[in-house]
Amino acid sequence: MAQPILVCSAHIHWDPEFCDVKLIQSMMLMEQLRQIMENFGHSFRPGHKKAGPESVQLLLCADFNSLPQSGVIEFIKNGRVPTNHPDLKVKDPLGSIFHDRQKLQC
């Protein structure tokens, strides 16, 4: 079986004043992509070996409306954002907010 690829197109909120909204939208996007990738093997090609999320390639095409030093880009690239990041207006007692997807190249 050829390696599956998930293609996602996204457009994140444009207004620089709402950097926290952009960050939350990006977090929600990554969580949905993680769920889709985890469920991938359950719904495609019955009778074949289940494809785990690590075997699915992700092509993320997005207008993040964010600068390279923004919380959005840091979250997408590194999988986490420290709670003292200027874009994050909500504090997390654990000290960081993260996703469990492998690092993505931007």
Sequence positions of predicted segments:
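Active-site regions of metal-assisted phosphoester/phosphodiester hydrolases
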Residues: 1-106
